[in-house]
A protein has these predicted regions:
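Ser/Thr/Asn(+Pro)-rich, low-complexity disordered segments
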Residues: 1-167, 171-174, 214-241, 269-272, ...
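Aromatic-rich carbohydrate-recognition surfaces in CAZymes
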Residues: 96-116, 128, 167-208, 254-262
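Surface-exposed helix-capping loop/turn segments at secondary-structure junctions
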Residues: 192-194, 217, 275
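Active/binding-pocket-proximal capping segment
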Residues: 200-207, 278, 282-289, 474
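Charged, terminal alpha-helix-loop-beta segments
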Residues: 211
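Active-site rim elements
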Residues: 247-252
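Active-site neighborhood of glycoside hydrolase catalytic domains
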Residues: 255-288
């Protein structure tokens, strides 16, 4: 028998069919999968459309409040110890000298520089930016034991020394290089000449191209190395899944570090005048956030099987989801690896405040269960990543986060106490993110206090004033090369 050709059936994943008006009323049969229900669409193509929420490179200075002296004291202390912010360039054991740890150090250094700048300490800002430039140039020069190497045969840029099989298996490049791209963009905001293509910007462009070139069919780098357009998120293993886990397909653990990378593309594209790259970054950033909400956090309750009792998946494989990490089963790190780094680009984590509280609410029980199995905090502090969780809570309840935070608590190696306190004080002053308002510029954010008062932010990377219109009717003129705030 031969049937008529009625065209293909496309299987849509939850992030493709959920709230997708273009396929409403057109979906047919569905079947269960590890990603939730796959629904069939009789068509040769379909589209997804998500709302880009925006972010700004940094938040304005905090000028009022009871803890300004504490913020100033922490800033002085962190600046005084600035040489400790980035791990040493070289040591006999290669301890934390890889591109990953160096990148985390660079990003926290430039974040601290932004806080210093916004709080009015330009001398501290310049000291920190000078330190960041020094380390970037050390690696980019190719004249030292720490360097990047382009392998023409493999079509990849690798950092030496490496960790996490970043060279052997081409793992985690978007995680590692995202920190570098973001830090370089922060430097470029203040020193465009440093970031020129014939200076250090050319190397930044290579880092970008390695993880997400906009060119198809190139002989140097593959198009979108890490990102899977159909799955809507990135994969971290460069070989597509190997060893004992190979049958489960590829995997990704730290979805939040992927978001950091795509935010870096947006910012670098905007600062360098590369609109094509900026727009690609917007697509990657916005799409992966939707996938994270479905497959890592299951905020809509459509993915996790009933027997899966955790509130999040910390590791996503092609064929399973898992509540663990590659290096530990300690609950705080299991939860935190999909939160860090928390910067201005990460406010999407607070889109569902009830989920934030529910997520954090499971930490106590998870920890008690872990300890009951004979585990102990012999290798890490009991308050590991205390600052990460405080910043996450602040997206839902800034006052509670500020009251619970201990300035003497542990510090994650991509953070500083100054940046953490500035984050919480900012949210206490401005309110939580208002995701109902958009703007006609890529670098913007809106916050809303409980009483209804809003704060509008816009960053203008160009050399001329730009008029910005927000979807609720508010307008402002963004001054060139800086952050502009209005609070009607």
């Amino acid at each position: 028998m031969e049937s008529a050709d009625n065209g293909p059936l496309i299987g849509l994943l939850p992030h493709q069919w959920f709230n997708n008006a273009s396929v409403a009323g057109k979906l047919g049969a569905a079947y269960d999968s590890v990603r939730g229900q796959i629904k069939l669409l009789a068509a040769s193509q379909f589209k997804t459309q998500y709302r880009y929420q925006g972010f700004v490179p940094h938040w304005p200075g905090v000028k009022e409040g009871p803890r300004l002296d504490e913020l100033a004291d922490l800033l002085k202390a962190d600046v005084r110890k600035r040489r400790e912010l980035i791990p040493g360039r070289e040591n006999n054991d290669n301890w934390r000298t890889s591109a990953y740890w160096q990148g985390k150090g660079l990003m926290r250094t430039t974040q601290l520089a932004s806080v210093a700048e916004q709080q009015g300490d330009l001398e501290a800002r310049d000291q920190l930016l000078g330190l960041a430039k020094e380390r970037v140039e050390w690696w980019f020069s190719g004249q030292n034991r720490s360097y990047f190497h382009y392998d023409k045969g493999l079509g990849t840029l690798s950092g030496f020394p490496d960790e996490f099989f970043a060279v052997e298996q081409i793992n985690d490049h978007h995680f590692h290089y995202g920190y570098w791209i973001r830090a370089a963009a922060e430097i470029a905001l203040r020193d465009p000449a440093w970031a020129a293509k014939d200076k250090w910007g050319g190397m930044v462009d290579m880092l970008v191209a390695d993880i997400a070139t906009t060119r198809r069919g190139g002989s140097d780098f593959p198009f979108l190395r890490n990102f899977d357009p159909y799955e809507g998120h990135s994969w971290a293993n460069g070989l597509g899944g190997v060893g004992e886990y190979g049958e489960l397909g590829n995997n990704q653990e730290s979805s939040s570090e992927a978001i950091n990378a795509w935010a870096g593309l947006i910012l670098w594209g905007e600062v360098s005048g590369n609109r094509e790259l900026r727009d690609l970054g917007v697509y990657l950033y916005t799409t992966e956030i939707e996938a994270i909400n479905h497959y890592w956090f299951d905020v809509h309750g459509q993915v996790f099987a009933p027997e899966y009792k955790h509130v999040e998946a910390s590791m996503l494989f092609g064929g399973k989801y898992s509540h663990n990490t590659w290096w530990t089963d300690e609950p705080r790190q299991i939860k935190g690896i999909n939160l860090l780094p928390i910067g201005t680009f990460a406010t999407h984590l607070g889109r569902d405040p009830k989920y934030v509280l529910r997520n954090l609410g499971t930490l106590k029980g998870d920890t008690e269960l872990w300890l009951s199995r004979g585990k102990s905090y012999s290798e890490v502090p009991k308050d590991t990543w205390h600052d990460v969780f405080a910043k996450y809570l602040a997206l839902a309840d800034p006052a509670a986060a500020l009251s619970q935070w201990d300035r003497y608590g542990s510090v994650e190696l991509g953070e500083t106490r100054t940046h953490t306190l500035h984050w919480m004080l900012s949210l206490n002053e401005m309110g939580t993110p208002d995701f109902g308002v958009t703007a006609d510029t890529p670098l913007y954010q809106v916050f809303k206090r409980a009483g209804g008062r809003k704060t509008y932010l816009a960053f203008n990377a160009s050399k001329a004033p730009v008029g910005v219109r927000f979807s609720d009717g508010q307008v402002l003129t963004a001054a060139p090369g800086m952050l502009t705030r209005t609070r009607p």
